[in-house]
């Protein structure tokens, strides 16, 4: 078994043996966009409008989400330049706080919040695919059985989701270059698809948004703003995935910080422009509570052809998002196995394809099982609290590593230190506290799930 780093502040010594350093800055920037842009931007604004019916405040929420994500990217970029290794955030937590906290991060990510996200996005892909192939709809039940927990059903959409995951696993199995090519093509396609909405709005819009600070029917704007931020943060999640693939970047110390900053800045700009197009396509009354807001906006601007175009864009977007997720998630599993806290076989690299093939298969099989179980959404909700908490703790690593390892080279230092890391920590802390107050059951469940990882860690360490 490979030796594992022991105490905080020790430099990682285990190399990413066998992996191919094939990714440059352009690929890394597109990876940030590809891993973050899934279905959120197409679905969340209508839900936000139901609690915050003001175009100005909704745009402020999206801008605030961009500032939070950018402060996170700037903060983690320093640690990324110090430890340009596969595993990303897992490695930073290990070096700053020790192996147990790093293990708990990987435990939560791989078992629930990341694999559950893959399952949810895959089912979303199948749901939109049913727009052009109705027989693949989630409402078409193929099999059902009674269980002690209730009736377990498997729909056509769940089967399509499993096929989607398997296809992407195969693409990433045969090489990081093939996975990267797919990501580049699909990310460019989804960004072009999103760009069509503002262009249509410029040409065909007949709605003039009410750019007032607060609408008259918003009795508690601050409370509504906080609720809306949950949707924004979800749509901005996964910015950190690019750190997990550092072991396959050609010059990660230079390019990884740049990719985080450029990618998140572009993402924020895209989200703001697309939301502005929604407000020019539909009056606020028609936006409120609408789930498929992009589809409805496109219909208002270009009729049924617009709706079909959006459906195609979402299909491309969700497929591409999961391609990036499988590519990145397997590297986290690989890093944990390399450190001896997961099955050692997952640290193997394919002799021909130079990919962590066992890790790719393991992640994809587990995500497929979650998709078939139908319970991923509930589990995902429970553990997102723990995910936000761990990323907040990870940001403290910048301060801790400056004290523990002042001698370690830092090709990039956080711009605006210490203000920028503090902004992310305070924003994350507010979100964690709000979730704890508003959703105590889910928050406690997330903490309990993390606690279950402690005996698993000690068992893996004793092997």
Where are the model-predicted features located?
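Hydrophobic, membrane-embedded alpha-helices of multi-pass small-molecule transporters
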Residues: 23-42, 160-168, 200-201, 215-269, ...
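Hydrophobic transmembrane alpha-helices that form the core helical bundles
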Residues: 47-50, 70-165, 170-173, 314-335, ...
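TM-loop-TM module centered on a large, flexible mid-protein loop between adjacent transmembrane helices
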Residues: 91-92, 98, 130-142, 217, ...
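Hydrophobic alpha-helical segments and their helix-loop junctions in multi-pass secondary transporters
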Residues: 126-135, 188-215, 233, 276-282, ...
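C-terminal membrane-solvent junction of multi-pass transporters and transport-like membrane proteins
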Residues: 153-156, 345-355, 391-442
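Membrane-interface loop-to-helix entry segments
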Residues: 156-204, 219, 237, 260-261, ...
């Amino acid at each position: 078994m490979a030796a594992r780093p022991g105490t905080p502040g020790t430099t990682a010594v285990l190399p990413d043996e066998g992996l191919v350093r094939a990714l440059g800055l352009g690929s890394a920037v597109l990876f940030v966009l590809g891993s973050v842009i899934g279905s959120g931007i197409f679905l969340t604004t209508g839900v936000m409008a139901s609690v915050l019916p003001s175009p100005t405040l909704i745009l402020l929420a999206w801008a605030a989400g961009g500032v939070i994500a950018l402060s996170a990217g700037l903060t983690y970029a320093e640690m990324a330049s110090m430890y340009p290794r596969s595993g990303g955030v897992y490695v930073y937590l290990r070096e700053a706080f020790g192996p147990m906290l790093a293990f708990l991060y990987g435990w939560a990510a791989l078992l629930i919040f990341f694999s559950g996200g893959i399952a949810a996005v895959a089912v979303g892909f199948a749901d939109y695919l049913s727009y052009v192939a109705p027989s693949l709809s989630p409402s078409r039940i193929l099999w059902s059985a009674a269980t002690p927990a209730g009736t377990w059903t498997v729909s056509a959409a769940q089967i399509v989701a499993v096929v989607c995951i398997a296809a992407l696993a195969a693409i990433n199995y045969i090489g990081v270059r093939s996975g990267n090519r797919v990501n580049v093509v699909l990310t460019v396609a989804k960004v072009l698809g999103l760009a069509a909405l503002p262009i249509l709005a410029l040409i065909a819009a007949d709605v003039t948004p009410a750019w007032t600070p607060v609408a008259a029917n918003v009795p508690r704007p601050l409370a509504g703003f906080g609720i809306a931020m949950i949707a924004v943060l979800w749509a901005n999640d996964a910015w950190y995935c690019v750190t997990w693939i550092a072991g396959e970047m050609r010059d990660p110390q230079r390019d990884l910080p740049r990719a985080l900053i450029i990618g998140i800045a572009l993402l924020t700009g895209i989200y703001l422009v697309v939301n502005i197009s929604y407000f020019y396509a539909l009056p606020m009354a028609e936006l409120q509570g609408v789930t498929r807001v992009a589809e409805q906006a496109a219909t208002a601007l270009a009729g049924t052809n617009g709706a079909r175009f959006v459906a195609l864009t979402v299909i491309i977007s969700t497929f591409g998002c999961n391609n990036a997720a499988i590519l990145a998630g397997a590297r986290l599993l690989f890093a944990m196995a390399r450190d001896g806290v997961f099955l050692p076989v997952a640290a193997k690299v394919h002799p021909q394809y130079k990919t962590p093939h066992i890790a790719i298969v393991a992640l994809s099989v587990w995500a497929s099982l979650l998709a078939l179980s139908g319970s991923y959404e509930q589990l995902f909700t429970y553990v997102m609290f723990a995910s936000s908490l761990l990323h907040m703790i990870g940001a403290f690593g910048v301060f801790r590593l400056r004290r523990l390892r002042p001698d370690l080279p830092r090709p990039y230092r956080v711009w605006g230190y210490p203000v920028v890391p503090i902004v992310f920590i305070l924003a994350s802390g507010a979100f964690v506290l709000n979730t704890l107050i508003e959703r105590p059951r889910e928050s406690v469940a997330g903490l309990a799930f993390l606690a279950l990882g402690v005996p698993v860690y000690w068992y893996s360490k004793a092997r």
